[in-house]
């Protein structure tokens, strides 16, 4: 039975499952417009996910062929995965921020092993042990990369321009650029009175930027063709403060559940990351590579119990925090170390 929530005012959410993922599901939002329904995100490209998406729309009396457009908060496969199939069935347009569209385009054009080569180089540079790198090389040589999600994601045909209203007949939906989780992540501010007249300025489709009970992953290793040294954590914290100033009545995130008090949740996340950075400075009293730092950080389980793929995510997050400390002048690289070590200033 599809799980559908009516948020009022012509807005619904559908729970679309993510296979083999502790997040469980993506909340795909449906926005009624004068030209037909528009989806905010689409879910993972998987038969069961597609069936739930179609079933959820059916429960609302909407055929997939009725979908007018798709607005993507960011390029990750649990958000953008089914966009191409939606477009094939309905002829809907797909809109995304240019920075994430560029990642999608480069990923589609690259040979399948490019991303694994890049990841292996990055992990070696931060001190990953050889036995961790061997499976990456084996996967590349086996050709299994051809089946990984995101390699053939649909190319968007519209650009989301920060600060501008999207062209949605009868609705006021404004794009807010919130880089950090991805370079082109956007939140979407529905500038309309809350249907229950909750105090505040409209509602916010927050994607993965602002979640009620999870701190979104802020890491590196997103784009093999990156040409600048990004500071995703710095970008994320700046973006959080902008969202906190909106004063929205309710947040409609892409995971978990809707919630009020965006400003309070923003404060919690800002405090969390400041505590995290302060804790890392204590660990960096002794020079460490980002890998060794990740081994010593607090996660939701001991390092030895963290699955292989999650370790890659963890060390990318550790390096993102180190990069923020370096940019703040609170840590520095140790000259002559290879792999590079960092120490608190």
Predicted region positions:
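Conserved beta-strand hairpin/beta-sheet module of binuclear metal-dependent hydrolase folds
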Residues: 2-60, 109, 187-212
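Short Pro/Gly-enriched beta-strand edge/turn motifs at strand-loop
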Residues: 8-16, 140-149, 169-173
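Active-site HxH/HxHxD metal-binding segment of metal-dependent hydrolases
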Residues: 24, 48-51, 57-167, 194, ...
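Metallo-beta-lactamase
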Residues: 37-38, 44-46, 148-149, 154-155, ...
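Histidine-centered divalent metal-coordination motifs
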Residues: 73-79, 97, 181, 185, ...
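Short, contiguous alpha-helical
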Residues: 88, 178, 326
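C-terminal regulatory/interaction regions
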Residues: 278-345
């Amino acid at each position: 039975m599809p799980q559908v929530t009516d948020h009022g005012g012509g807005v619904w959410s559908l729970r679309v499952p993510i296979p083999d993922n502790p997040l469980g599901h993506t909340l795909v939002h449906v926005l009624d417009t004068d030209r037909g329904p528009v989806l905010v995100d689409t879910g993972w490209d998987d038969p069961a996910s597609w069936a739930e998406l179609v079933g959820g729309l059916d429960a609302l009396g909407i055929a997939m062929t009725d979908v007018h457009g798709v607005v993507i908060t960011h390029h990750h496969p649990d958000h953008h995965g089914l966009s191409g199939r939606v477009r094939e069935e309905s002829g809907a347009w797909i809109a995304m921020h240019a920075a994430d569209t560029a990642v999608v385009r480069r990923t589609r054009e690259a040979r399948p092993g490019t991303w694994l080569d890049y990841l292996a180089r990055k992990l070696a540079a931060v001190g990953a042990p050889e036995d961790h790198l061997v499976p990456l090389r084996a996967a590349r040589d086996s050709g299994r990369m051809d089946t990984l999600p995101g390699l053939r994601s649909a190319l968007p045909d519209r650009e989301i321009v920060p600060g501008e209203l999207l062209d949605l007949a009868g609705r006021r939906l404004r794009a807010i650029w919130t880089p950090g989780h991805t370079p082109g992540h956007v939140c979407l501010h529905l500038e309309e009175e809350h249907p229950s007249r909750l105090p505040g300025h409209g509602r916010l489709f927050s994607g993965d930027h602002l979640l009620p009970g999870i701190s979104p992953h802020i890491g590196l290793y997103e784009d093999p063709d990156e040409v600048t040294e990004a500071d995703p954590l710095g970008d994320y914290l700046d973006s959080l403060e902008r969202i906190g100033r909106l004063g929205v009545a309710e947040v409609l995130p892409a995971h978990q559940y809707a919630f009020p008090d965006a400003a309070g949740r923003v404060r919690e996340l800002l405090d969390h990351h400041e505590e995290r950075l302060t804790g890392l400075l204590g660990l960096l009293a002794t020079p460490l590579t980002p890998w060794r730092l990740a081994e010593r950080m607090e996660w939701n389980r001991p390092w030895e119990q963290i699955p292989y793929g999650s370790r890659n995510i963890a060390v990318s997050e550790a390096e993102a925090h180190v990069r923020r400390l370096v940019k703040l002048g609170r840590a520095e690289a140790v000259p002559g170390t290879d792999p590079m070590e960092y120490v608190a200033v």
